[in-house]
Amino acid sequence: MERVILHSDLNNFYASVECLYNPSLRGKPVAVSGNPEARHGIVLAKNYAAKACGVATGNPLWMAKEKCPDIVFVPPHYDLYMKYSQIAQEIYSEYTDQVEPYGLDECWMDVTGSTHLFGDGKAIADKLRERIKFELGVTASVGVSYNKIFAKLGSDMKKPDATTVI
């Protein structure tokens, strides 16, 4: 039996969590960053609205503001990110015990032994995305393949909120 590997990437995770906890940020360009008043720091994460303006992770704050004058900078809240990451891990663990986290927002899962219970890899990926959206309020892109490299490639191919089989 060919292995079935999933890679889940929670889309714009830090910025998405910030928008959940501060609804006034929704629809605005948002970047999780250092302190803009201290005039130092970089963009740690951004949402799609900021990305559409050309803001990139790693940009100095002055550059992000230059590219996107309406951008809202928010400080990181790692306790919230950890909480949401843990909930996502618990969801993943309901489908397989072979979960390999990579940072707070990504992980690989070997669901080979779970397909007889939950359906093929695409069906499992779609269920995971649906549950993450419903239970966490964020979206995920999930790649499905026979190895980790191609599964990761799949999760990177279509964003946000997509399943890609390679």
Which residues does each PLM region occupy?
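Gly/Gly-Pro- and Ser/Thr-rich, intrinsically disordered tail segments characteristic of DNA damage-repair
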Residues: 1-166
